[in-house]
Structure formats: C-alpha cells, structure tokens
Amino acid sequence: LKAADLLKEATKARGRLAGRVLAIGGASIDARLEPAGPEVLARRLGIEVEEVGLDEVGEAMEKVDSLEVEEELRSLARFMKLKEPVEAPVRLYLASKRLMEERRATGVTFNCFSLLPAVKCTPCIAVSKLIDEGVLAVCEAEAPTLGAAAIVHRLLGLPFFVANVAKAQGGIVLAHCTAPASLCSGSVEALPHFESGMPAALDVELKLGQVTLVALSKRLEELMVSLGKVKASSLKEEGLCRTQAFVEVGDPMDLLSSSPGGHLVLAYGDLRLSLRKAAEALSLDFREVGEKVLR
C-alpha cells in the first residue's frame, strides 16, 4: 500500500478502537505500571480509560430498581443453571450499564480483586452479558488484555473469551471465570467464584473447533497470535476457574515461552490474516507463535 493508503487504514482502525472504557473499581496494579498503563493504551490504540471508584459502584448498585433485577433473573433462568444466588451480580451488571450510559462509555473493564470485597460479588455475569450485547467488556483491568480484546471485538466484530493458561501438557488448558453465552455449545452454570467463593462465576461449555489465541505485548507494541483447536470444554477440574477448555496448539511450549504472560484472548476461526492486517494498520509488530501446523 502507498503511504497515503496506509495512513487512511490506520486512521480508520484507530477510529473503530477509540472510545471511553470505564475501569470499574479502578485500574489494576499491573495496568498502572509503565509502560503498559492506560496512558500508553490511549496513545497507541486511542482507548481512553476512566476509573470509577468503589463508592460510586456501590451507590450505582443501590439505585438499581428491584423490579429490573427480578426481570433479569427470570431472563437468566431461561438459559442458565442458577446453582448460586445471583441477585448481587445482576445488580452489578445493571449498574455497570447505567454508569456506561451516564459517562458515554463504549466499554468496561473490572478490577476484580479490589471490587469483590467491596460489593461482595463478581462481575462475571456482567462481562458475559455485555460482550453478547456488543459491548467491549474485559476482566481484571489489564491494559494489554484490554487492547487485545478491543482489536478482536471492535475491528473483527467477534465475541471472545479471556483466559489464563492453567496447564500445558499435550496442549494447553485455558481457564477463567466467565465467557459469553454466544460461545457456548451446551450448558451455562452459575457457580461460586473459585478464588473467593462469592457469587457467581460461570461454567460455560465452549464450542469445539478452530480458534485463534491473541495477546498484546506488555509495551503494547507487538500483537502475538497462535492457531489452536478447542478439543474439550466444561472440564470441571478442581483448583481452576470455572470455564475451562483444553486447546490443542502446534507447540505449547513455544506459545508459553513467547507469550507476554497474563491473559490470552480466544476467538473462533483462523483470524491470522485479519489480525496481521489489523496490526499493520495500527503500526504494531505481528508475530505467530506455536508454529507447528495443526492438521
């Protein structure tokens, strides 16, 4: 492409990424560390992070109408096995939507481990619901994860699952406490949150099939991707977050040694070409990891 065309593509990509994202409970400790803080996220990707304090979150939850909560509980019960009381998580979901409307935000991220003790519940239901409503919603308020998820969600228009690598043996086991129901092939269960025991984490039985794993480097300069296949889900392994999936990758050790740490963003399909183009438009380096070809 000519320089003028590259500039046009870059401007278009940044325009689609740009917007205000609320950090409910504040930005995480990791996100405050330079060079991967909110300021770098704004400069490189045009994503503005606005912190929302714990007192404000609590007040917003108190203002949620009980009738709205009851209506949402009935809606959840149509597709979710509610093995855990979820009134408080539903209040947090509805309060988050209201805060976004009031502050004209287009996305939200949650500082989970400052939030949980304050509101006595998790944002897992909120994250799951908001992603399926077309909102950029991300756990744990980390700048690299937020940036990678924004690229997948806003540039490619896809729902996503943010997860930790819990194990690596013949593949990798990804685990986290929520995923959008649109990625589900079977059941969705609300269970006690693994680390805290609070309500509620989700066990989402993810669809089997080809996926792309995505991560941004700590300096937000390099986009790393790996092709994989979800071979099993809803593993129900003890000692792990509730949504679990075994993912076959070409070279698990290369993936682990090459990735920046933290979370991976999973989306369905072979997205390597689209992500390469996105990286070029955003002036990011691009690297494929886990390079053995999967048949």
Q: What are the roles of these predicted feature ranges?
A:
Residues 1-28, 160-183:
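Internal, active-site/partner-interface "lid" segment
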Residues 49-52, 111, 158-164, 288-293:
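Flexible, glycine/charged-enriched surface loops at secondary-structure junctions
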Residues 7-121:
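A charged, amphipathic alpha-helical module
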Residues 120-137:
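A short, gly/pro- and small-residue-rich
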Residues 1-3, 55-61, 168-170, 294-295:
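A short acidic, often aromatic-flanked loop/helix-cap motif at beta-alpha or helix-coil junctions
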Residues 39-42, 93-97, 145-153, 275-279:
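Predominant activation on well-ordered alpha-helical scaffold segments within soluble catalytic domains
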Residues 134-235:
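C-terminal catalytic subdomain
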Residues 201-295:
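Extended hydrophobic packing segments that form well-structured cores
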